[in-house]
């Protein structure tokens, strides 16, 4: 059974879609969570932390004055990949999930500071299921024609390589690594609410073996940040005017998993058998 976790301030909501609050309520703005087994990682005040899904004291892994974002557990949970501003530019790093010295993996100059609605360069999205590469979204074009593209970065170091998909926002590998679920349009950092225009996102699958794509959702609303858990795909959608988590199973219409009415589901991320979100 799928477990769904939500980080709201320092509150974790756990189990199969509903559970009691499990932590204190004094900390705010926990962001960009990821989950692996009984551990979650997240960003607070620009640093990376981990905590148990059952609650308790969070463990601080970084303390550099540079901003760290988008932590993602490796498939075996032993490492965390993330992006950070340590040397004047944003780059991708990896470190042990128990804490330790970060290792820099990318060396390509980033595009510099973008406007808030442009988000961040070098967004860490996922690992390949074999743990050998890290999937990132990065910009490589001038401002006037800037688009984000997916790249694979070797986890042990080496040159990054572009993926076949020409442009995209959030994305994640299928459990067997043969496909990617993604949105061709990136709009995660826009502040548009209940948008129904030409930049509304839909969820697609790209088959890496066949080099073909398939559209899964076709809705005037926003469908974004898709993740893959087992045979099912989960994504955030505001088709009911608040971003909630939806489940897509092959051959079925998407169904709502959460029913929030006041606050949106943001930045859902998945482990082998669970989804966590802001």
Place the predicted regions along the sequence by residue.
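Sec/Tat signal peptide C-region and signal peptidase I cleavage site
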Residues: 19-23
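Bacterial N-terminal signal peptides
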Residues: 7-18
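Beta-strand-rich domains and repeat architectures in extracellular enzymes and scaffolds
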Residues: 24-53
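Conserved beta-strand position repeated across blades of beta-propeller domains
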Residues: 34, 72, 126, 172, ...
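N-terminal secretory signal peptides that target proteins for export/translocation
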Residues: 1-4
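A flexible loop/linker signature enriched in serine peptidases of the S9 family
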Residues: 43-49, 63-68, 83-97, 101-122, ...
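Short coil/turn segments that connect the beta-strands within blades of beta-propeller domains
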Residues: 37-38, 76-78, 130-132, 176-178, ...
């Amino acid at each position: 059974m799928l477990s769904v976790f939500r980080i709201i301030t320092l509150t974790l909501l756990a189990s199969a879609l509903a559970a009691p609050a499990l932590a204190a309520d004094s900390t705010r703005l926990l962001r960009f969570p990821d989950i692996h087994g009984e551990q979650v990682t997240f960003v607070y005040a620009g640093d990376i932390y981990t905590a148990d899904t059952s609650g308790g004291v969070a463990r601080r892994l970084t303390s550099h004055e540079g901003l760290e974002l988008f932590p993602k557990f490796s498939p075996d949970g032993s490492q965390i990949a993330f992006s950070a501003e340590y040397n004047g530019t944003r780059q991708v790093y990896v470190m042990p999930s128990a804490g330790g010295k970060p290792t820099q993996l990318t060396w390509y100059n980033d595009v510099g500071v973008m406007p808030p609605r442009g988000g961040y360069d070098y967004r860490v999205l996922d690992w390949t299921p074999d743990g050998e590469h890290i999937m990132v979204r990065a910009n490589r074009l001038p401002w006037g024609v800037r688009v984000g593209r997916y790249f694979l970065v070797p986890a042990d170091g080496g040159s990054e390589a572009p993926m076949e998909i020409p442009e995209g926002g959030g994305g994640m590998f299928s459990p067997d690594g043969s496909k990617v679920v993604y949105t061709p349009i990136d709009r995660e950092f826009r502040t548009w609410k209940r948008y129904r225009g030409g930049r509304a996102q839909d969820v697609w699958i790209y088959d890496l073996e066949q080099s073909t794509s398939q559209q899964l959702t076709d809705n005037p609303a926003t469908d974004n940040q898709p993740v893959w858990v087992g045979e099912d795909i989960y994504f955030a959608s505001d088709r009911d005017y608040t971003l909630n988590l939806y489940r897509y199973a092959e051959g079925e219409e998407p169904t709502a998993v959460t029913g929030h009415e006041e606050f949106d589901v943001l930045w859902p991320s998945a482990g082998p058998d669970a989804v966590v979100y802001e």
